Curated annotation (Swiss-Prot):
It holds the Pfam family H2O2_YaaD. This is UPF0246 protein str1967. One of its GO terms (biological process) is response to hydroperoxide. Belongs to the UPF0246 family. GO terms for cellular component: cytosol. The lineage of its organism: Bacteria, Bacillati, Bacillota, Bacilli, Lactobacillales. HAMAP family: UPF0246 (MF_00652). PANTHER family: PEROXIDE STRESS RESISTANCE PROTEIN YAAA (PTHR30283:SF4), PEROXIDE STRESS RESPONSE PROTEIN YAAA (PTHR30283).
Length: 246
């Protein structure tokens, strides 16, 4: 068996409502700090326009009041990566895979299972807020480290450095990483759009093929991406897609 870590997303799209889950003490402490912030404070913390900050203020107030609706995390997040993850018409095996092998790294909830019930909110490790005098990365480090320390199976990171940096450097080395590139006339290139789409497509391929070992991941091909042994190492997997000349 393998576990996969994926990031959260700013873009959200409410789906079918589910029962709520009591917030952990660590999340409650973050909620307390976020609820103290005014619309202007949120505008600065998020680096967004005042009208957008007003929407976020309403969301935090609703969570604080216990009035916010809850949705499965993997269905609520709707960023580019998530839109490329198969989330509808899942077979029993595919849903079981998402339920037990895919975990989402959140700066508000911690590391949660894919279908964990969450509320609409905007929060990531770039959010300028301190909890108990700590940055969000330091605040969550012990719990993130514990996830890796207690994992009895390989953990594959589909995270950006923003999320990987939460783990202690010594434990971060335990992660298997996956990178995606395009071959344009012999020149290898990558950028965030390629990576986000490919992460979702990769996870879908893993789910559909029921890959349960790192070697099985190396055998995958999807969306014209193929494993490149010459670029890869024992813990780093590179997949490249050739782009035809226009």
């Amino acid at each position: 068996m393998i576990r996969f870590l994926i990031p959260t997303a700013k873009e959200m799209k409410p789906s079918k409502e589910v029962p709520s889950q009591k917030l952990s003490e660590k999340s409650e402490a973050i909620l307390t700090e976020m609820a103290k912030l005014s619309t202007d404070d949120l505008s600065i913390a998020y680096k967004i326009k005042p009208e957008q900050a007003e929407k976020e203020k309403q969301r935090w107030d609703a969570i604080l009041a216990g009035e916010a609706k809850n949705y499965p995390a993997v269905e609520l997040f709707n960023g580019l990566m998530y839109r490329h993850i198969k989330r509808k018409d899942l077979s029993t095996c595919e849903k079981d895979f998402l339920s037990h092998q895919v975990f989402i790294t959140s700066s508000f909830y911690g590391i949660i299972p894919a279908f964990y019930p969450i509320q609409e909110h905007r929060h990531d490790f770039h959010t300028k807020v301190k909890v108990n005098g700590q940055s969000l990365k330091n605040y969550w480090r012990a719990e993130y480290d514990q996830f890796l320390e207690e994992s009895q199976v390989p953990v594959v990171s589909l995270l950006s450095s923003e999320f990987e940096d939460v783990f202690s450097p010594s434990l971060r080395k335990q992660l298997f990483t996956v990178s995606f590139m395009e071959d344009r006339n012999g020149i290898l290139k990558t950028h965030s759009t390629i990576s986000k789409k490919a992460r979702g497509a990769f996870l879908t391929a893993v789910m559909e093929e029921s890959c349960q070992t790192i070697d099985a991941l190396r055998d995958l091909s999807f969306d014209d991406f193929y494993y490149r042994k010459d670029l890869s190492s024992d813990s780093e997997l590179f997949f490249v897609r050739k782009v035809k000349k226009v």
